[in-house]
Amino acid sequence: MNTTVLAKLEHISLTAGQREILHDVSLEVYPQSILTVIGPNGAGKSTLLKILLGLRKPDSGSVWRKPGLSIGYVPQKFHLDRLLPLTVERFIGLSLPRFDRMRISEVAGITGVAHLLQQAFQSLSGGEVQRVLLARALLNQPELLVLDEPGQGVDVNGLGELYKLINQLKQHHGYGVLMVSHDLHLVMAAADQVLCLNRHICCSGQPEAVSRHPEYLRLFGNGYSTMGLGVYAHHHDHKHDIHGSVIPLTKEQSHG
């Protein structure tokens, strides 16, 4: 793995009113490596991505991005007015300052949607939409891809192919990838590093180690089932070392 850091977050914390969104979260993203953030709904995953992208400011902590870093972003939610007549080619081209058919064809070929370029965007399936959004994210030759739930709306058969494509982008083009996903069984197969988040870092490391970690099992149970993803009631009666292991707080620390 290339050890040049593309972007990093250090000790990020954020609250909204009385609700703690993130507490003391740190991470680093490297070229040619996939870091996947997993966790239950409401764990702060999408917020964490927005902070790294500069779309939201934390209350404390620091954000660093490599100078001149080019980022391709696929958001969790995307809506296009179904009454707007737009081909896939035109939709991808909206991200360019000047329409460049050759570049559009190139990224469409990389993501497997070249045959869809003249189709209406509104006619696409969920899996096709995600591949088109990924093609658009590649237009400006990014060093880092930030993908928020790229498997959303994709059927079971298409999920494996989508994650295979993301892995190929990492291997063949050297992209760093920071991804949020709920598809635990596929994440564990595709990611180089996994960070389990529930407003704080529960555990992190290589997928196999994370899948055996007590905090991961506490959230998700045995295996990679996505059932029962409710947020556990978290009281700061512990903290974690750099490997995600639980360190009990002293009585003074837990009330401080």
Language model features by range: what are they?
Residues 101-116:
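Conserved ABC ATPase "signature" region
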Residues 212, 219-256:
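ABC ATPase nucleotide-binding domains
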Residues 120-124, 128:
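Conserved ABC ATPase signature
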Residues 181-182:
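H-loop/switch region of ABC-family ATPase nucleotide-binding domains
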Residues 141:
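Conserved catalytic motifs of ABC-family nucleotide-binding domains
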Residues 194-206:
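H-loop (His-switch) and adjacent beta-strand-loop-beta switch element
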Residues 145-149:
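Catalytic Walker B motif of ABC-type/P-loop ATPase nucleotide-binding domains
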